[in-house]
């Protein structure tokens, strides 16, 4: 099992391990693909996607025993059985009380795979799961407590599979998963599941990435979003790049325990536009601006928590009130305004208020195109949502334009032969 051509693992100065190109890659070219080492479909997508291959289709067949896993056909059901059998009987016996988190489910599958798989897999051509960083020594008490809760859930729902694992090993594995796990998303960036892609995890982060990771079922694909020359390191982005430098680095330190020194973080050249203020005859004081940024960061976090327990109309009210308050100091293209508009759009989509969703989306798309890199999935998915909203409201001319804008980005990011591209082209023919 050879390594993909044109790439090699190396020691990246100041960053530890990394991946570099040994030949040049053109814009949109596939560098490599990586099948998932293990993966799990998210609970909310059960019945919409096959648990084994993640295909989205209607009329999937249920597992005869637990009635909670869904498959395209017998082949997919058989393919998934080594992993589904970890859960099937527990799902039956626990009923409504079966509630392990996605991280716990994924970790149980890693443990099961490690018991049966002794050779390196096709997902580990550059790096094995065992080599993952855990950053265990850097975890604060809150993060350690969350891991302890996950270990308890693992023992509760997967007792047969973890009876001979000691707590220290489980703590280490959960810390590895937290740093190296991936979320699989669809073309509109809706969450489909979680997975482990060891070779993809080898790539280091930059806020000016030269590759992008997309998914074809349960396979990750890595494509160039800039021209890459021989000898250059291959960088992906670990985080959402909308936010200003300080916020991005707070997120990187909290989740991955490092700060970024890429060109964007060194120059901060996009920050002034991302944090732009209203031109007022009586400009706000520096302290007022700082206070509003603090308020904005707090409301972002408050909303994230509120999603779990508030009603859609209450969530929309949080968005509207915060936009009203921030709008006294920030312009509409300020990233904190955009963040809350995006949340409001999501709530409108959930409530099937298509006109409301469109109102927010139309405000978001132009600044998104300015703040994000050229071939951004965030921009593509926004054009796609807008296009589908316009088409649904029979505004076909403007809908066609929006869908074509999404396609132009996706043909580079996903590759021209991706089934998402074929689906959108079908939508354009209607």
From Swiss-Prot:
Record-annotated membrane-spanning stretches: none
Binding-site positions, S-adenosyl-L-methionine: 15-17, 135, 204-205, 256-258
Domain SET: 5-239
Domain of life: Eukaryota
GO molecular function list: histone H3K36 methyltransferase activity; histone H3K4 trimethyltransferase activity; protein-lysine N-methyltransferase activity; RNA polymerase II complex binding; zinc ion binding
InterPro entries per UniProt: H3K4_H4K5_MeTrfase, SET_dom, SET_dom_sf, SMYD2_SET, TPR-like_helical_dom_sf, Znf_MYND
SMART domains, alphabetized: SET
Gene Ontology CC annotation, any one: nucleus
SUPFAM superfamilies registered for this protein in UniProt: SET domain, TPR-like
Binding site for Zn(2+) 1: 50, 53, 72, 76
Keywords (A to Z) from UniProt: Chromatin regulator, Cytoplasm, Metal-binding, Methyltransferase, Nucleus, S-adenosyl-L-methionine, Transcription, Transcription regulation, Transferase, Zinc, Zinc-finger
Reactions that this protein is recorded to catalyse: L-lysyl(4)-[histone H3] + 3 S-adenosyl-L-methionine = N(6),N(6),N(6)-trimethyl-L-lysyl(4)-[histone H3] + 3 S-adenosyl-L-homocysteine + 3 H(+); L-lysyl-[protein] + S-adenosyl-L-methionine = N(6)-methyl-L-lysyl-[protein] + S-adenosyl-L-homocysteine + H(+)
Principal location listed in the UniProt entry: cytoplasm
Disulfide-bond pairs as recorded: none
Enzyme Commission number, as recorded: 2.1.1.-, 2.1.1.354
Positions of Zn(2+) 2 binding: 63, 66, 84, 88
Zinc fingers typed MYND-type, residue spans: 50-88
A Gene Ontology BP annotation from the UniProt entry: peptidyl-lysine monomethylation
One of the Pfam families matching this protein, by short name: SET
Family: Belongs to the class V-like SAM-binding methyltransferase superfamily.
PANTHER family the UniProt entry points to: HISTONE-LYSINE N-METHYLTRANSFERASE SMYD (PTHR12197), N-LYSINE METHYLTRANSFERASE SMYD2 (PTHR12197:SF193)
Protein function: Protein-lysine N-methyltransferase that methylates both histones and non-histone proteins, including p53/TP53 and RB1. Specifically trimethylates histone H3 'Lys-4' (H3K4me3) in vivo. The activity requires interaction with HSP90alpha. Shows even higher methyltransferase activity on p53/TP53. Monomethylates 'Lys-370' of p53/TP53, leading to decreased DNA-binding activity and subsequent transcriptional regulation activity of p53/TP53. Monomethylates RB1 at 'Lys-860'.
Name used for this protein in its record: N-lysine methyltransferase SMYD2-B
